[in-house]
Curated annotation (Swiss-Prot):
Matching Pfam families: Formyl_trans_C, Formyl_trans_N
Name recorded for this polypeptide: Methionyl-tRNA formyltransferase
Chain positions recorded as (6S)-5,6,7,8-tetrahydrofolate binding sites: S112, L113, L114, P115
Entry keyword annotation includes Transferase: yes
UniProt keyword Calcium present: no
A single MF term (Gene Ontology): methionyl-tRNA formyltransferase activity
Function description: Attaches a formyl group to the free amino group of methionyl-tRNA(fMet). The formyl group appears to play a dual role in the initiator identity of N-formylmethionyl-tRNA by promoting its recognition by IF2 and preventing the misappropriation of this tRNA by the elongation apparatus.
GO cellular component, one term: cytosol
Name of the gene: fmt
Length: 330
């Protein structure tokens, strides 16, 4: 099939590679414009653009600032005569004019079990809220935000010690697998009026119950409050990886890996943390050091059970763990 691919971050790259590997013709790639990144503030292409240029040769790569406001770009897309659009973390809402172009529709790979966590940050919110499961849905796109009916969906369990980067890696490959499975079904259903196409595909409308929105994160969301409970703090550290931070003796401290020392969660913790979770700990000022565990990290007080800080990055220094972390922060 002739596929127009929309995507921007590294999360979308496995799907681009999988569709190309499955023999589909990628007739164009749409991604966010180059951005200034790094210490030198050099203009850098998105991961999808970089991979597309390497993988697909002279296939056109379009980088609209605002696809809704660019009729010329929309005309360029129509001229590619794609059979369908595949969208994975593109980063902009597609206007109706674009959604109506491909005869087999526009399909989005969304990283949650819809209708939970519609929006741009489903992975972060899933982890911050402690969801036991998440997954991927292949959804027929419509003008609403992640409201379309679902063709395929697959769930996976979320691990307590899994951070956003690790979960995103798993979900990105699951998205690729599901699109490779979905496209032959979409092709077999054929073109036609949207309602008839979707009926032939037996898509599942989203429920009106259980809807939640993965709102955009603010700077305040990334600040850790030690007066919260250990599990809530841990979930923020995992969900906001690598951005959760606090102030430590006047410097910013990024929190990269923690374990909540909650006895009932011992079977999900590392052996060292599981043993620590069984101890009786004294009450102390939230955020203060209760114990430095040699070769492991620092046990810090919270409003309830303590939390084990295993890896962090102090402002102006490299990330550290174990004894190096203890030396820096003690």
């Amino acid at each position: 099939m002739r596929v127009l691919f929309w995507g921007t971050p590294a999360y979308a790259v496995p799907t681009l590679e999988a569709l190309h590997g499955a023999g589909h013709q990628i007739v164009g790639v749409v991604t966010q414009p180059d951005r200034r990144r790094g210490r030198g503030s050099s203009l850098m292409p998105s991961p999808v653009k970089a991979r597309a240029l390497d993988l697909l040769g002279d296939v056109p790569v379009l980088t609209p600032q605002r696809i809704r406001r660019e009729p010329e770009t929309q005309e360029q897309l129509a001229a590619l005569q794609a059979d369908l659009s595949v969208v994975v973390a593109f980063g902009q809402l597609l206007p109706p004019e674009v959604l109506q172009q491909p005869p087999l529709g526009c399909w989005n790979g969304h990283g949650s079990l819809l209708p939970r966590w519609r929006g741009a940050g489903p992975i972060q919110w899933c982890l911050m809220e402690g969801d036991a499961q998440t997954g991927v849905g292949i959804m027929a796109m419509e003008p609403g935000l992640d409201t379309g009916p679902v063709l395929l969906e697959r769930a996976l369990d979320v691990q307590l010690l899994e951070n956003a980067a690790g979960l995103a890696e798993r979900l990105s490959h699951l998205t690729a697998e599901l699109f490779v499975e979905a496209l032959p079904r979409i092709e077999a259903a054929g073109p036609g009026p949207e309602a008839e196409r979707l009926s032939r595909l037996a898509v599942t409308p989203q429920s009106d119950e259980g809807v939640s929105l993965a709102r955009l994160l603010s700077k305040d969301d990334y600040r850790i409050d030690w007066s919260e409970r250990a599990l809530a703090i841990h979930r923020k550290v995992m969900g906001l990886f690598p951005g959760a931070h606090c102030s430590w003796r006047g410097k910013r401290l990024k929190l990269l890996a923690t374990e909540p020392l909650v006895a009932r969660l011992a079977d999900q913790l590392s052996p060292q943390a599981a043993a620590l979770s069984q101890r009786q700990w004294p009450s102390a000022e939230p955020g203060s050091i209760l114990e430095a565990v040699r070769g492991v990290g620092l046990v810090l007080a919270t409003s309830g059970c303590p939390i084990l800080l295993r890896q962090a990055q102090l402002e102006g220094k490299a990330a550290s763990s174990g004894d190096s972390l203890i030396q820096q922060l003690s």
